[in-house]
């Protein structure tokens, strides 16, 4: 193991525990809910589950795209379960979550990429758990505006789509069908829609990007109106995935946060263990929406 791949101390985390965590874990196991928290072995699982948030995955566990940073299985996915949105909403209601993030594999085998399935899940969640904030982390749907509209019209509170990396590294890091500028167009289209959605994206560092490229990415994201940005350390999930080119220090993450904030994001979460679905960012969104609700009342 080389210096570039040996994990530093700041990436070591304690084993998850706590009453809230154990309660959510039991419900997840009983309902057979597919959570990204477990699938991706997220280091923040105890903080999130214990604090009333979770990230769940729709449309199966087999993806039609092969991104070189991602540990999800690739292949021909099974048919969609039409009851999945209902079962998801029932499980989330039982967990009494304050914030739910719904994401999915890519389903390029579906005519609409799974957009209508996402929309069904959003509507069921909002019906069963009206006080739960619903964030969706969506694929690019090949940039098809009709499919993006299907998701937007279901009115999630937050819609996220990840650019993942800087423009130069996109062909190396992401599946060849994923395009940097297409992702920007997706985010711009969603932001400009009449639903008034908050938009969010995530960038991994440690893949070989330069500071200048990161700054250009921050600028590109603000140019299309992205509200919330999360920055985190890329970690190699297996020997078959892209290697870590560098481990970014906590101090450098703070510098990136300051730089990104200068471009006008509503919120930037930046740190070694920050992930796309990150408790601090969700806490910010919850507070923002509560302030908006009070303003409407008052």
Swiss-Prot record:
SMART domains: Elp3. Transmembrane segments: none annotated. Its main location: cytoplasm. GO terms for molecular function: 4 iron, 4 sulfur cluster binding; lipoate synthase activity; metal ion binding. It is found in: Cytoplasm. Pathway: Protein modification; protein lipoylation via endogenous pathway; protein N(6)-(lipoyl)lysine from octanoyl-[acyl-carrier-protein]: step 2/2. It catalyses: [[Fe-S] cluster scaffold protein carrying a second [4Fe-4S](2+) cluster] + N(6)-octanoyl-L-lysyl-[protein] + 2 oxidized [2Fe-2S]-[ferredoxin] + 2 S-adenosyl-L-methionine + 4 H(+) = [[Fe-S] cluster scaffold protein] + N(6)-[(R)-dihydrolipoyl]-L-lysyl-[protein] + 4 Fe(3+) + 2 hydrogen sulfide + 2 5'-deoxyadenosine + 2 L-methionine + 2 reduced [2Fe-2S]-[ferredoxin]. It is an enzyme of class 2 (transferase). Disulfide bonds: none annotated. Belongs to the radical SAM superfamily. Lipoyl synthase family. Keywords: 4Fe-4S, Cytoplasm, Iron, Iron-sulfur, Metal-binding, S-adenosyl-L-methionine, Transferase. This is Lipoyl synthase. [4Fe-4S] cluster 1 binds at residues 37, 42, 48, 277.
